[in-house]
């Protein structure tokens, strides 16, 4: 049963820094572009909370405060996915993004963008030992874009997830990272702070086809695992409260490759912001809603400009416009 969201009369407890500088007042009026009139009419309290987590751009802030994100993925065959995730995290507003990939993918990913910090370590003999020191510096890790399914690489990633659990590191697991989880669910069981981002096929692999038993299966994962099921209407499942939220419909009929990578990268940035700016609704839920809403509108904007020829690169180019229309702080 989908829960209808409502504004709680209880006070919302915010992080002290958010109250003073990072979060806007709840009564701030946001004027949205007419290009998204249909979606802008949505009055979901989750959208308001998503706006509230966006930090103000202030001169006293230093590099890294808006987010240091890690992407684990990138193989010989798949170099685009980690790039899409990484550049999306940056364009949403993260300060630094590190990509941990196979050696064969490193030069290609570096050539896509000089803004990315690329580490060709995943297939090295001592991969976990070399990557572990970097993990402590990162705020959120995205595991899976372009990872591939090589057995030895998946074993390395399994070890990295175990290290992240010890560090209590927030994770976003996507694509081939979900393939790994499907075969070893214990990696995320009772791991507070994990977000899974399956599409329809990946969702069935994880939870089966019986939708009436989704919450029971989710409960078995343990408290603290959040799932966003990507589809016509993205659905967010919160295992902490066993509640389900539905994101508004949006986008276009064009489903280009890489859209899920855009969402994963954007989600990582939003997730860090939400964790820094605590609200009464789960930070993971708020971040999932924000990433879904942004991605669907990027699709809408890009399709209006490019139509059937639209690609993920066109969607990424629209992140600025969508963010400015929906999430950005406006001066009165």
From Swiss-Prot:
Domain of life according to the entry: Eukaryota
Alphabetical list of InterPro entries matching this protein: CARKD, Ribokinase-like
Domain YjeF C-terminal: 46-326
Key words, A-Z: ATP-binding, Lyase, NAD, NADP, Nucleotide-binding, Phosphoprotein
Binding-site residues, (6S)-NADPHX: 146, 199-205, 261
EC number: 4.2.1.93
Binding site for ATP: 230-234, 251-260
Gene3D superfamilies cross-referenced by the UniProt entry: 3.40.1190.20
Cited PROSITE patterns: YJEF_C_3
GO MF terms, alphabetically ordered: ATP binding; ATP-dependent NAD(P)H-hydrate dehydratase activity
Any one GO BP annotation for this protein: metabolite repair
Pfam families linked to this entry: Carb_kinase
Cofactor field: Mg(2+)
Enzyme class: lyase
Catalytic activity: (6S)-NADHX + ATP = ADP + phosphate + NADH + H(+); (6S)-NADPHX + ATP = ADP + phosphate + NADPH + H(+)
Family: Belongs to the NnrD/CARKD family.
Task of the protein: Catalyzes the dehydration of the S-form of NAD(P)HX at the expense of ATP, which is converted to ADP. Together with NAD(P)HX epimerase, which catalyzes the epimerization of the S- and R-forms, the enzyme allows the repair of both epimers of NAD(P)HX, a damaged form of NAD(P)H that is a result of enzymatic or heat-dependent hydration.
HAMAP family according to UniProt: NADHX_dehydratase
Protein name: ATP-dependent (S)-NAD(P)H-hydrate dehydratase
Species: Aedes aegypti (Yellowfever mosquito)
């Amino acid at each position: 049963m989908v829960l209808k969201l409502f504004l709680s009369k209880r006070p919302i407890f915010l992080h002290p820094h958010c109250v003073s500088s990072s979060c806007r007042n709840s009564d701030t009026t946001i004027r949205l572009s007419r290009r998204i009139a249909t979606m802008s009419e949505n009055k979901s309290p989750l959208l308001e909370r998503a706006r509230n987590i966006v930090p103000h751009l202030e001169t006293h802030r230093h590099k890294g405060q808006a987010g240091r994100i890690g992407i684990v993925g990138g193989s010989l065959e798949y170099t685009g996915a980690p790039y899409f995730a990484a550049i999306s995290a940056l364009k949403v507003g993260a300060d630094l993004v590190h990509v941990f990939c196979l050696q064969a993918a490193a030069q290609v990913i570096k050539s896509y963008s000089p803004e990315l910090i690329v580490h060709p370590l995943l297939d090295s003999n001592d991969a976990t030992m070399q990557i572990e020191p970097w993990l402590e510096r990162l705020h959120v890790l995205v595991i899976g874009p372009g990872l591939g399914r090589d057995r030895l690489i998946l074993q390395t990633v399994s070890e990295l997830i175990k290290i992240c659990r010890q560090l209590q590191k927030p994770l976003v697991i996507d694509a081939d990272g979900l393939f790994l989880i499907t075969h070893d669910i214990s990696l995320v069981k009772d791991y507070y702070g994990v977000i899974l981002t399956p599409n329809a096929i990946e969702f069935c692999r994880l939870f089966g086809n019986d939708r009436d038993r989704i919450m029971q299966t989710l409960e078995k994962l343990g408290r603290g695992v959040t799932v966003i099921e990507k589809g016509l209407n993205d659905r967010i499942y919160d295992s902490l409260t066993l509640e389900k939220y539905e994101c508004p419909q949006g986008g276009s009929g064009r489903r280009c490759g890489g859209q899920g990578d855009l969402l994963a990268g954007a989600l990582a940035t939003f997730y860090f912001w939400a964790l820094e700016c605590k609200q009464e609704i789960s930070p993971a839920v708020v971040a999932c809603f924000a990433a879904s809403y942004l991605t669907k509108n990027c699709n809408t904007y890009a399709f209006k400009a490019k139509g059937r020829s639209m690609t993920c690169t066109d969607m990424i180019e629209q992140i600025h416009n969508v963010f400015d229309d929906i999430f950005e702080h406006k001066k009165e």
